[in-house]
Design a protein with these regions (language model features):
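Acidic, proline/glycine-rich low-complexity IDRs
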Residues: 5-11, 125-173
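A broad, structure-centric signal for solvent-exposed, well-ordered loop/edge residues
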Residues: 16, 28, 54-57, 152
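Mixed-charge (acidic/basic) macromolecular-recognition segments
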Residues: 33-131
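Short linear, low-complexity motifs centered on an aromatic residue
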Residues: 30-48, 153-165, 169
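Short coil/turn linker and secondary-structure boundary residues
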Residues: 22-26, 68, 104, 119, ...
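Short amphipathic beta-strand/extended segments with alternating polar/hydrophobic composition
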Residues: 19-23, 58-61, 170-173
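N-terminal ordered "arm"
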Residues: 1-44
């Protein structure tokens, strides 16, 4: 999924030019060959996000990409198979304050978070009722279920998050 992914490495050295890169290999190659106007190698860069998918953009925001984290970012970006994994990862890091390191994988937190897509708590309650989360309810009793009250109860266990333009509700285990 990284075919549109583009970054710019802006040197902190004002006598040097930056460079665009789309992969770790390209970054390493350009990093090693880039010199300032005095012929000295450039050591520090600000990494600027230029282009990518919605999931790659969110991943960039989550990882607070700095020069030393470029290999980790590309490792995680290569693991993107769907938006759900990135949403789960975003919630784990941003809302649940999970720590990430060089060994972290994109799906490490999937088993710890239950995510549901809905616009409001009432929509979530109605979704749960329709999916049978309350068990089999006889037809003659279905009109007595108060979706608003159930939605209010769900607020105790589920939290709302806006990730990648999606409103999701999650519960962590």
């Amino acid at each position: 999924m990284t075919n549109t992914l583009t970054f710019f490495a802006q040197p902190y050295d004002i006598s040097a030019c930056g460079f665009y890169f789309t992969s770790l290999d390209e970054y390493n190659s350009k990093y090693k060959s880039n010199v300032n106007s005095y012929g000295q190698p450039i050591e520090e860069y600000e990494i600027q996000y230029i282009n990518g998918s919605k999931a790659e953009t969110e991943l960039f925001a989550i990882t607070s990409l700095e020069q030393m984290h470029i290999p980790q970012y590309f490792k995680l970006a290569d693991q993107i198979t769907n938006d759900h994994d990135v949403i789960s990862f975003s919630i784990a890091v941003n809302d649940l304050h999970k720590k990430i390191d060089a060994d972290t994988n994109l799906d490490d937190f999937n088993d710890e978070i239950s995510i549901h897509y809905a616009d409001t708590y009432k929509d979530l309650a109605e979704q749960f009722i329709d999916e049978g989360m309350l068990g089999d309810i006889p037809q003659h009793l279905q009109n007595y279920i108060d979706a608003d009250a159930y939605a209010n109860d769900l607020k105790c266990d589920y939290f709302k998050a806006d990730v990648m333009g999606e409103t999701v509700f999650y519960m962590s285990f």
